Amino acid sequence: GLGDVYKRQNMDSHFLQLDNRKGQDRTMHSLNTEQIQQIIPHRHPFLLIDQIEDYVPGEYAVGYKGVSYHEDFFRGHFPQKAVMPGVLILEALAQTGAVAILSLPENRGKIAFFGGVQKCRFKGMVLPGDRLRLETRIIKRKGPVGVGEATASVDGKTVVTAELTFMVGE
């Protein structure tokens, strides 16, 4: 509809501004949930990032998820002690990396598929009420395949680190 055309024009303008920066000033570039959904295909209930605080296409993204007690996964993980499942933290990190990789002009409209997880360490728990900080830096890319170095933290304390392999496809 007309609203989609307007949103698309706004995102195209946003991407054009990023494309024209060419490493000039390093000001922060943030995205809200609506803008995130124009880059990656994930939707509720599986969109696990609320905001991107900063990103550079093809290089890195830093995002956040506000972890609410009302998340569906807390009903069964665990009823007596609500803890965010580690695999969902990894997925949130992957989605953050997908923002960095899929915001490249040549990857718009594509999907970043999970290829693997290496060097994963769970170092702490994520609980209801936490603000989960997600950072993924693209450290290798060859054709459609790449690797991201990912770190999740709460209040400055690292809770998960991993290397995430991805493949960009249609």
Predicted segments with their positions:
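Short, small-residue-biased leader/transition segments that mark boundaries at the very start
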Residues: 1-6
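Short aromatic-glycine motifs in intrinsically disordered, low-complexity regions
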Residues: 33-43
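HotDog/MaoC-like acyl-thioester-processing domains
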Residues: 41, 57, 127-130, 137-170
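Catalytic strand-loop segment that frames the active site of acyl-thioester-processing enzymes
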Residues: 44-84
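Conserved positions in beta-strands of structured domains
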Residues: 50-53, 118, 123, 135-139
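Active-site helix/loop of acyl-thioester processing domains in fatty-acid/polyketide metabolism
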Residues: 52, 84-107
